[in-house]
Amino acid sequence: MNTKTRSFTDREIRGIPSNERSAFLKKRYLDSPLMVDIEYIKHLTASHKRTDSMEIIERRAADHAYALSHMTPVIHEWDTLAGNKTRYIRGAIPYVNYAAGPFLKEMRKEEQDAQSKYTEQGQGGGIEKARHEAEQDDFRLISGKFLIPREEYNEFKEICEYWEEKCFMEQGERLWKSIFNKAEFIENGWKTGLYTAPHEPCPEGRLILDFETALAKGYNKIIRETEEKINSFQPGNILDGAKLNFWRAAVSVLKGAVVFVGNYASQAERMAKEEKNHYRKEELEQMAYACRNVPMEAPRNFREAVQSFWFTYLLGHIEGSHLGYSPGKLDMLLYPYYKNDPDTSPEMAIALFEELFVKMTQIEYIASLSWQGLGHGNLYQNLILGGLDKNGDRADNELSLIILQAQVNMQMTQPTLSVWWDNKLDSEFLMKAVECVKTGVGYPAFFNQSIYIQHELKTSGLPVETIRKHAAIGGCTEPTLQGMAYGIVQAGFVNHGKIIDLVINQGIDPVTGIRMYEPRELESFEDVLNYYIDIMHEAIRNWQQYWNYVMIAHRNTVPLIFCSVFVNNCLDKGKCMDDGGAVLNQSVTTLSSGMVNVANSLAVIKKLVYDDKVCTLEELFQATREDWVGFESLRKKALGVPHWGNDEANVDKIYLDLYYDYCNWVAGQVNYLGKPYDPSMLAISTPVPFGKVCNAFPDGRKKGEPLADGVTSPFPGTDVNGPTAVIRSSSKVDHSRIRGGLLNLKFHPSALRGESGSKNLLALIKTYFENPGFQVQFNVVDSRMLIDAQLHPENYRDLVVRVAGFSAYWVEMSKALQDQVIWRTEHSL
């Protein structure tokens, strides 16, 4: 083993699991390869072949219930919480009922989607383990990093072939490609990198269920209430029949879920009878006892409350191909059960959450190669703490501290933690949150709850008490209402950087040569700005209309039934979420990435071409076409123009003008549920692949370099006036205009050392939110340590860093994404 380089400053806080079990569970996870488990989709397919005559809502429920009831109830060594999504420690269900094409293309050795060639995956950790084991005769490799047992490979191929013409993606393509008059624009958008790859393989998520009702009522009571609706049903018009379909579907999936849980109870009982170790036997008996009660009935104690939550959360996860499906406000949900259970000590609660977080991290997803690269394997499960209750009082509690401590100890990538900020929050809670940040894992992220309340008051008009109670984060950084919203289902991202390419080259993509927009005379700065805006408008409008077509196919192939049961108003209305059953249907967003690069480039154009007349517009554009080779002096001048993130009025105004135009245009289009699209801007891993498809920019960025991440994060190396200037620039934005937001800041560990360092960071957050900002997150890491981790990855298997709205294991990140994190400006306080 290599000896770690000691010329860097390590993290101040180094947590360790609280007990032997937690340490074992974490190590087992880290040592496991990534696996594909076809069991669920095999049973779903078997049912689908027999249910062709059924109405789609009831058919979807029947197929899902059948699959649930036939899944193997796997209880791993040392588990005390029952329930797993797959049979493996790190397992993914291939949802070929959503998209079979990407798997079949790989099996047939056909070309993947246009963006797959720009996709990079990590090399280490579980990925390396899978690739090594794939060299053996027992396994085949899928999607570059997942193993499938060789004896299941041909069966999986047959399942994919069955779904090839029936899956959601194929049904959607048949619809929009035959009707939509901008279909060619969409396909060219994928080829050029104007858009992220097709999102049908994993469209759903950013969804949080009503776990409060699930726990308090239990499934049996919900089944009885729904059956009463069915029995008392009297149609008033022909459309009322859809209510009956949904209610029967709801009962079907709930009964399937009860069988799923009962199978775990039976398995635990069988294992307990055979177990020789007295302590393990008691654990299995306790597990079986809990599984005979929850989630069918209300929990009797804290452990059962956690088990009940986990079953409902897991069952919702199994139903759909989710990214961003989240646990929500777990401290508020579970605190009453903890407070009223004298037999559960803080230490016991910490251990239980440590196990829960391992189980959440064990859930993997497999999709198209492009989306695996964009997501970097993260499911964006977001657990939000703190904030206010419905009455406006602070909502942090003892369980908030316990959850933070559990992640300080474990440092798992799932769930990412977040904090709803309010000045009423307890200082001990905030200091514990900063302690977690100082481990270097990049969470919790901090969100200004008052900004989200303003946004929701504008978009939904719901009472402020309702918004406070249900406010949560679904996915990376997207606020939503827990148990009340459809989720934030969107098409993917628009690449603002590619639009710069199109402006520079008169509507032609310089990489592929495809014409995306008509040429235009550019005489003034306003001409350049308006050309950019017009192309952006065209790209967004076409993207939104395309997605509206796609979601028609979603409703007709893979509507969410189980999840709809636990979203308010669906059962009352007799409508699933795809039919508009949720309370909130305005949460559908349009996403984009790279606007900071646009603002920087326009600022340089304005300064060098039109204000100072250092060069002509064509000279500057030619410099970017040549990747600045032979134009080094001009590039130096471009880099010398103030960029975003330095509290400089000129570039900040340009950014604000772009931002508000984007918000207004997005909100001017109607989503597939008949409500305005909600503007949002995020990043996930898009800065790397989006940057790869772009030429050099006028702001000094070179060809292929990543774009700026997030919404208001500066381009790496250009924020030269310190973190206070960064937050001043970001504070100029009205963050209540969008559903989401992200500001990345990176600090050297020495900058936050000790209690004074923690208080200084809290003061910075407080200043930002009072200005008012919306979201901020931190990497607290020495860049030299990250460089050492690139050189000696074997010494850093459990190193976690913040990427965008999520954290990831360093060794499982691509080299390009690692470089992007290293490249970010390292600040001091």
Model-derived features: positions:
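Conserved catalytic cores of very large enzyme subunits
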Residues: 2-247, 279, 283-290, 294-829
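Extended non-globular scaffold/tether segments
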Residues: 248-259
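Extended, non-transmembrane alpha-helical coiled-coils
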Residues: 259, 263-266, 270, 286-289
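A conserved hydrophobic secondary-structure block that centers on an alpha-helix together
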Residues: 261, 271-282
